[in-house]
């Protein structure tokens, strides 16, 4: 086989593995240490036998349903590459919508305290820090292993005003007397009894980042009940949460039952599913 980039791309695409275009190019970027633009401009470039061998190893693991992000130990999120491993949830494309919803608020303010609860890899909070490095960003998680990954990403992007804090959900803010101006969070939201979950998610991703009690509503209920304890209500504040596509009605009922006094709205994702809750006072 002529091992040009062009032929290798076709080889990967023709394997019986479900990969999107971005995944295919991410594999090549990882193996030859070149970016997308270089790759598509050098399709006649020949790969070495060692590089071909590494690609074959990756394809073998993918055939066993091993997640690509864990194989490469990296995942694109909001146009940046983040380090990930099996200790953190793999960042999803739909989670980028959280950054879309907060970007204007982050860019237009230089003295915010931004808190990323249940941070995992840190991709949400770090993406905010990269939008405006004048704000202070705190990444929190109950898992020390997750924070080790998040801290590695902080160092990767040379962020001075971003730090990690270990603790349980909002308790870590209350304990440290922290009141945020912006809270972003993609908490565990899968019902413990939910049987309709992809097998590779169950088999490989950390359960602590997936499942929550009370039909997956546990973290939303706690946050909604305690907003005044964790945000600075004397200034403009913004909270953006991600939730499961079938949870909108249940979360809306939580808001109503708790007589939330702040503005709130729901937003859909790329596939027209309800995905985000936005709470704010402006």
Swiss-Prot record:
Binding-site list for S-adenosyl-L-methionine: 141, 169, 186
GO biological process: methylation
EC top class, as a word: transferase
Keywords: Methyltransferase, S-adenosyl-L-methionine, Transferase
Binding site for substrate: 186-189
Keyword Plastid: no
A GO molecular-function annotation: protein-(glutamine-N5) methyltransferase activity
EC number annotated for this UniProt entry: 2.1.1.297
Pfam families cross-referenced by the UniProt entry: MTS (PF05175), PrmC_N (PF17827)
Catalytic activity entry: L-glutaminyl-[peptide chain release factor] + S-adenosyl-L-methionine = N(5)-methyl-L-glutaminyl-[peptide chain release factor] + S-adenosyl-L-homocysteine + H(+)
Signal peptide (from-to): none
Function in brief: Methylates the class 1 translation termination release factors RF1/PrfA and RF2/PrfB on the glutamine residue of the universally conserved GGQ motif.
NCBIfam families (alphabetical): hemK_fam, RF_mod_PrmC
Similarity annotation: Belongs to the protein N5-glutamine methyltransferase family. PrmC subfamily.
Protein name (Swiss-Prot/TrEMBL): Release factor glutamine methyltransferase
